[in-house]
């Protein structure tokens, strides 16, 4: 989740300060199926795993078999020569170990002066890469020679690990002076130019504050879920359970990062209210009391339906607690950008801040 905060603040800083920089959003082609077993073993040994542990992992990875199912007919089992089995609880951990080698290669190149990251005034030595599983974002200073070095690093990593980068599905975003050479960068990497907002870990990223239209994905999820319940004659108690356990949880991830616009909040409450009073949300039905009363706790006469506005503020306040009690990359970025060595009590809200 911290990666979303870093991504949002970086994009906002590059755009508002008109700084030069490049963001490269990488797409791996069938990531889990391409991992080379030999590279995995070398990575485990490099990270200090014992030989016994490496042998266990080798037996687990190479000991599996697969079969092909065509028209309900399952073929004979056979062994594969590379890749990690999807659905296995160990596979994500091993994939992260392999993918982390890309970050190591980039950090070594940065230490040698071959590449430089963005926003060095907020992040020590500049921000160069963000990784979460197979979601990888690369940040690069506006310099064509550095871009060539980065392309070479990606090709080397692809050859060593087996993780093939799908450049045709990858996207590049240019800021400041880099926009004038966007075509050259695009041709170098063989990718497309990205547009805002784009999604990172399921969250829309934009250089401005999100508008009502950017929340349409949440409203669409509400409507799709409600359409599956349409026509089912459930009781008030049944609909109350569905409200609290399913419908109210749909926007939680977005509410953890952004303040919900008032118009979006009203529409989501309208969908929930319509479903509660009538199983068909498209049909109007007389409401016996205000929705605010329904959202009150049971000991105050309500039904305990989740108040999205209050929940939104609670989720956002968790970031404040983490900011004051942590020392990670995103905490240092926010402190350097907003606090600048001052205590939090001296911070003032400025219009237009992210």
Regions found by a protein language model. Give the residues of each.
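A helix-boundary/hinge signal
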Residues: 1-354
């Amino acid at each position: 989740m911290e990666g979303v905060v870093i991504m949002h603040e970086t994009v906002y800083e590059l755009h508002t300060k008109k700084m030069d920089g490049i963001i490269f959003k990488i797409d791996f082609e069938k990531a889990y199926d391409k991992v080379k077993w030999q590279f995995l073993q070398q990575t485990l040994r490099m990270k200090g795993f014992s030989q016994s542990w490496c042998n266990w992992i080798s037996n687990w990875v190479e000991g599996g078999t697969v079969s092909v199912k065509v028209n309900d007919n399952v073929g004979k089992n056979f062994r594969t020569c590379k890749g990690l089995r999807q659905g296995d609880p160990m596979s994500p951990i091993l994939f992260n170990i392999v993918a982390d080698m890309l970050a190591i290669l980039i950090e070594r190149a940065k230490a040698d002066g071959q590449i430089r990251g963005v926003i060095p005034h907020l992040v020590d030595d500049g921000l160069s890469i963000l990784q979460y599983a197979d979601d990888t974002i690369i940040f690069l200073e506006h310099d064509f020679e550095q871009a060539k070095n980065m392309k070479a690093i990606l090709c080397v990593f692809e050859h060593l690990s087996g993780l093939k980068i799908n450049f045709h599905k990858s996207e590049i975003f240019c800021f400041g002076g880099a926009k004038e050479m966007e075509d050259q960068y695009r041709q170098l990497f063989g990718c497309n130019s990205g547009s805002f907002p784009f999604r990172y870990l399921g969250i829309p990223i934009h250089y401005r504050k999100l508008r009502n239209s950017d929340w349409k994905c949440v409203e669409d999820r509400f409507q799709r879920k409600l359409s599956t319940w349409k026509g089912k004659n459930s009781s008030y108690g049944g609909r109350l359970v569905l409200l609290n356990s399913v419908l109210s949880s749909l926007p939680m991830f977005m509410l953890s990062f952004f303040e919900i616009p008032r118009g979006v909040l009203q529409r989501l409450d309208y969908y929930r209210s319509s479903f509660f009073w009538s199983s068909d949300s498209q049909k109007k039905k007389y409401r016996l009391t205000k929705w605010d009363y329904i959202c009150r706790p049971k000991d105050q006469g309500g039904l305990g339906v989740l108040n999205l506005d209050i929940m939104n503020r609670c989720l956002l306040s968790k970031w404040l607690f983490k900011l004051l009690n942590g020392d990670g990359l995103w905490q240092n970025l926010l402190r350097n950008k907003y606090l600048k060595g001052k205590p939090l009590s001296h911070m003032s809200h400025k219009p237009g801040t992210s």
